Amino acid sequence: MGLNENQRYAIEKYYYEMYYALLAYAKSALNERSLAEEAVQDTFRIACAKADDFLSSSNPNGWLLNTLKNVIHNMIRSR
């Protein structure tokens, strides 16, 4: 099942608000822009897949950052 219109709008809002901050964090952890971009995109893919959990979180920005940290950890571990 896909996102409803309200979920899509809310996630887009977080994308535009948080993308560059998340990218900066990922670049500092991964030392490569293309990998950092991939990590941030994976983070938002997960946010879309878990939209109910993400959007009902008491701290959506923190949810995104924690998800990004997990994505980065998995990327580093799989190298």
Task: Give short role names for the model-derived ranges.
Residues 1-24, 28:
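A short, charge-rich alpha-helical start-of-domain segment used by transcription regulators
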Residues 38-45, 58-70:
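Structural recognition of an alpha-helix C-terminal capping motif at a helix-to-coil junction
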Residues 55, 66-79:
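Arg/Lys-rich amphipathic alpha helix in sigma70-family domain 2
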